[in-house]
């Protein structure tokens, strides 16, 4: 099974020539500039053009040339293969890789599993759930998140009592 990343959602059509209005699901809208092809509904589509608008993009894909054809793709996701994803800087991670990680504090106490990541203007927030306990929201800050081991699906954070008090 291929490993895909959703980078945008088709929210509507644009015009009558098969263009698609895209809501980007990436924090770097410029990543669309270098796309040669994308996957929509498990079909590979060549990118013909990309136009940027405030908070959205207009994408023209090969083989979608009419309004009727474009309508079929409404609410679908634009995806790329992991190998074609933007290369991250050290200390950056894909949300898809963070979700499912087990979280421990520095005393090796099991706090649960990351089930969601909330992206805010200042930083991400990891949503952690452990059965029978209240969910924990952890700001993804360097002084709180001490270690992330994606290959081991493990995150180590500062003891909750230490950072909740400050």
Swiss-Prot record:
InterPro entries: PRC-brl_dom (IPR027275), PRC_barrel-like_sf (IPR011033), RimM (IPR011961), RimM_N (IPR002676), RimM_N_sf (IPR036976), Transl_B-barrel_sf (IPR009000). An accessory protein needed during the final step in the assembly of 30S ribosomal subunit, possibly for assembly of the head region. Essential for efficient processing of 16S rRNA. May be needed both before and after RbfA during the maturation of 16S rRNA. It has affinity for free ribosomal 30S subunits but not for 70S ribosomes. This is Ribosome maturation factor RimM. One of its GO terms (cellular component) is cytoplasm. Keywords: Chaperone, Cytoplasm, Ribosome biogenesis, rRNA processing. It is found in: Cytoplasm. It comes from the Bacteria. PANTHER family: RIBOSOME MATURATION FACTOR RIMM (PTHR33692:SF1). Residues 90-163 form the PRC barrel domain. Binds ribosomal protein uS19. Transmembrane segments: none annotated. GO terms for molecular function: ribosome binding. GO terms for biological process: ribosomal small subunit biogenesis; rRNA processing. Belongs to the RimM family. The PRC barrel domain binds ribosomal protein uS19.
């Amino acid at each position: 099974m291929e490993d895909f990343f959703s980078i945008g959602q088709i929210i509507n059509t644009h015009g009558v020539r098969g263009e698609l209005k895209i809501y980007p699901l990436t924090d770097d809208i410029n990543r669309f500039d270098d796309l040669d092809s994308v996957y929509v509904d498990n079909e590979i589509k060549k990118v013909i053009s990309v136009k940027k608008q405030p908070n959205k993009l207009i994408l023209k894909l090969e083989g979608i040339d009419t309004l009727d054809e474009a309508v079929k793709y409404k609410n679908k996701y634009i995806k790329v293969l992991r190998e074609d994803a933007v290369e991250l800087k050290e200390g950056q991670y894909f949300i898809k890789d963070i979700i499912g990680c087990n979280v421990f504090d520095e005393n090796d106490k099991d706090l649960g599993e990351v089930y969601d990541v909330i992206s805010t203007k200042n930083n991400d927030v990891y949503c952690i759930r452990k059965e029978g306990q209240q969910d924990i929201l952890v700001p993804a800050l360097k002084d709180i998140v001490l270690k992330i081991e994606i290959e081991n699906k493990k995150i180590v954070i500062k003891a909750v009592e230490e950072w909740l008090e400050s």
